[in-house]
C-alpha cells in the first residue's frame, strides 16, 4: 500500500521557535525528535506572510501571482481546479482535514472527502448581519462540540482575548477542552473511522500559537517566570512610538508594556509546547493503530509572528520573524530511503509542499503546480533548485515586497519607497540595514533588478520595467475575483 501522508500545520509559528532550530528557551521534545530524525529545512519561507494567501500556496502549489492572493482578504471564493486534497482523493486516498482551513465559503471541501472545521475566531465569520453560511455557528465544528460539553452559552470570546491581540492569559476551561486538544481528538478518531482499504491523507491544522494567547495553565506557567530573551532590535528600528500605537491591543507596530510583552511570549511559547505534547499524543495513537512506520509527516507553519522584534507584531511583513517558518519531514519507517537527520539550506516556499507530498505518494503532479518537489533533494539526486523567493504583502502604508536567498534579503516598502538590505549569512537577526553600503551596492542592484522582473506586467503598476514604482496595492488579483 502507498504511504499515509500527514500534513501537520500550525498557525503563526516562527521558524526559530523549535529547540532543534537553536532556541534554547522553548521545549519542543516531540517536534525536535521528528526534525532530528527526519529532514529539516532551515530556509523555508512564505511568499505572502498571512493566513489566507499562505494556505492558498499550500492548497494549490502555485505562486501568489497565479493563485491570486497577495494580501489578506476574506470572502473571495476558492475555485481552484487542482488542490493537494483533490489529487490525493483522485489517487485513491481517504482524505480528511481537521482544524483550520480559512477558505471561502468556509465549508468548501477543496477536494477533501470530509472536513472537521475550526478556523478560530474570525471577525468575518462572526458578522451577525452576514449570510448564515458565514456565521460561526454554521461553520465551526469545534464550537458545536465545545457547547455540547459546557453548555450552549459558552463562546470563543469568554476569556476576553481578541484573536489578534498581544494580551495573554491561561485558558479558562479544562485543558482537554482546548481547541489544540480537539484537533488531536478528532485526528485520532479519524484513525478509527478511516477506510482500512485505502491509504490516507490527513491534514491536522492547529489554530495556535496564533492569538488568542491562551495556553492551558500548565503550559503558561512553564514560561511565565522564565527569563525569556528580549525582542530583537535592529539599528534601523523605530525606537519611538509617537502615535501610541502600542496602546492598541491589536497593534501591528509600536511599543507595548514590557511586562505584557513578556507574558505574551510566555503564552506564545506555552502554546507551542502544548501543541508539541499533543502531537506526541497523536504519534502514540498512530503507533497503536500500527500505521506509524507507513506514514510520512510534513510539519509547517503558514507564517510567523514578529512578537515585538524591531517593535513589530503579528505578520504581513518581510522580516524573518514574520516570513520564515519551521519546515521538516519525518519518515519513521524510512520509506524515502534518504539520509535521515540532514539539515538543508535550500530556499523553500509553501508552494513546494503539494508537489513534494504528491511525489512521496507517486502521484502525478498537475501542470498548474509551480512549486518544486523536495524528493530529489532528500534522495541526494542531482537536481537544480531556485536561487530566490519573491515575497510580498499588500498592507496599506506598509505594503511590501522582498527577494530572499539563502545568503541575503532585499526589501522594498512600495508605498513609501523605502528599501532595506540584510546580509543573512552574517546577520541572521536582521540587526543591520546595509542598504547604503558601498560594499553591497552591486548585489543590491542585482536583487532590485530581480524584483523588477518579478513585478513586470502586474496590475498594481509596481514597475515600468526599469525601476520600481509606488503602484496601487490590492489584496486579491483580478483574475480570481
UniProtKB/Swiss-Prot annotation:
Its EC number is 3.1.6.1. Ca(2+) binds at residues 11-12, 51, 302-303. One of its GO terms (cellular component) is cytoplasm. The keyword Metal-binding applies. GO terms for molecular function: arylsulfatase activity; metal ion binding. This is Arylsulfatase. Its cofactor is Ca(2+). The modification 3-oxoalanine (Cys) is found at residue 51. Belongs to the sulfatase family. The active site is at 51 (nucleophile), 102. Pfam families: Sulfatase (PF00884). It comes from the Bacteria. Has sulfatase activity toward para-nitrophenyl sulfate, which is increased in presence of calcium ion. The conversion to 3-oxoalanine (also known as C-formylglycine, FGly), of a serine or cysteine residue in prokaryotes and of a cysteine residue in eukaryotes, is critical for catalytic activity. This conversion can be carried out in vitro by AnSME under anaerobic conditions. The keyword Nucleotide-binding does not apply. It catalyses: an aryl sulfate + H2O = a phenol + sulfate + H(+). It is an enzyme of class 3 (hydrolase). Binds 1 Ca(2+) ion per subunit. InterPro entries: Alkaline_phosphatase_core_sf, Sulfatase_CS, Sulfatase_N. Keywords: Calcium, Hydrolase, Metal-binding, Oxidation.
Amino acid at each position: 500500500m502507498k504511504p499515509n501522508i500527514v500534513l501537520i500545520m500550525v498557525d503563526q509559528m516562527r521558524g526559530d521557535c523549535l529547540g532543534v532550530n537553536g532556541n534554547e528557551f522553548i521545549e519542543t521534545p516531540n517536534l525536535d525528535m521528528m526534525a532530528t530524525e527526519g529532514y529539516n529545512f532551515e530556509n523555508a519561507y512564505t511568499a505572502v506572510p498571512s493566513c489566507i494567501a499562505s494556505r492558498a500556496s499550500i492548497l494549490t502549489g502555485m505562486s501568489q501571482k497565479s493563485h491570486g492572493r497577495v494580501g489578506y482578504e476574506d470572502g473571495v471564493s476558492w475555485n481552484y481546479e487542482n488542490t493537494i486534497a483533490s489529487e490525493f482523493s483522485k489517487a485513491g486516498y481517504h482524505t480528511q482535514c481537521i482544524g483550520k482551513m480559512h477558505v471561502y465559503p468556509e465549508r468548501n471541501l477543496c477536494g477533501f472527502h470530509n472536513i472537521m472545521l475550526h478556523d478560530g475566531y474570525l471577525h468575518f465569520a462572526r458578522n451577525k448581519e452576514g449570510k448564515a453560511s458565514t456565521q460561526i455557528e454554521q461553520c465551526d465544528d469545534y464550537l458545536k462540540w465545545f457547547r455540547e460539553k459546557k453548555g450552549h452559552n459558552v463562546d470563543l470570546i469568554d476569556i476576553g482575548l481578541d484573536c489578534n491581540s498581544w494580551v495573554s492569559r491561561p485558558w479558562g476551561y479544562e485543558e482537554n477542552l482546548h481547541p489544540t486538544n480537539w484537533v488531536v481528538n478528532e485526528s485520532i478518531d479519524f484513525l478509527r473511522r478511516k477506510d482500512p482499504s485505502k491509504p490516507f491523507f490527513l491534514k491536522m491544522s492547529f489554530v495556535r500559537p496564533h492569538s488568542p494567547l491562551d495556553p492551558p495553565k500548565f503550559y503558561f506557567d512553564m514560561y511565565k517566570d522564565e527569563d525569556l530573551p528580549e525582542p530583537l532590535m535592529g539599528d534601523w528600528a523605530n525606537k519611538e512610538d509617537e502615535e501610541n500605537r502600542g496602546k492598541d491591543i491589536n497593534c501591528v507596530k509600536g511599543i507595548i508594556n514590557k511586562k505584557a510583552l513578556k507574558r505574551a511570549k510566555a503564552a506564545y511559547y506555552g502554546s507551542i509546547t502544548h501543541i508539541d505534547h499533543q502531537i506526541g499524543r497523536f504519534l502514540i495513537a498512530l503507533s497503536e493503530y500500527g500505521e506509524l512506520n507507513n506514514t510520512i509527516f510534513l510539519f509547517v507553519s503558514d507564517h510567523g509572528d514578529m512578537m515585538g522584534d524591531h517593535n513589530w507584531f503579528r505578520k504581513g511583513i518581510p522580516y524573518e520573524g514574520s516570513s520564515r517558518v519551521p519546515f521538516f519531514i519525518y519518515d519513521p519507517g524510512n520509506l524515502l530511503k534518504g539520509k535521515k537527520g540532514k539539515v538543508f539550506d535550500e530556499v523553500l516556499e509553501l508552494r513546494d509542499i503539494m508537489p513534494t507530498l504528491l511525489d512521496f505518494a507517486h502521484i502525478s503532479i498537475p501542470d498548474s503546480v509551480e512549486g518544486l518537489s523536495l524528493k530529489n533533494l532528500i534522495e541526494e539526486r542531482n537536481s537544480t533548485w531556485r536561487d530566490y523567493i519573491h515575497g510580498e504583502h499588500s498592507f496599506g502604508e506598509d505594503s511590501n515586497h522582498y527577494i530572499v536567498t539563502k545568503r541575503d534579503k532585499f526589501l522594498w516598502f512600495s508605498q513609501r519607497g523605502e528599501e532595506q538590505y540584510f546580509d543573512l549569512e552574517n546577520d541572521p537577526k536582521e540587526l543591520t540595514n546595509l542598504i547604503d553600503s558601498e560594499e553591497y551596492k552591486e548585489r543590491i542592484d542585482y536583487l532590485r533588478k530581480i524584483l523588477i522582473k518579478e513585478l513586470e506586467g502586474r496590475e498594481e503598476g509596481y514597475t515600468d520595467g526599469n525601476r520600481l514604482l509606488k503602484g496601487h496595492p490590492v489584496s486579491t488579483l483580478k483574475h480570481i475575483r
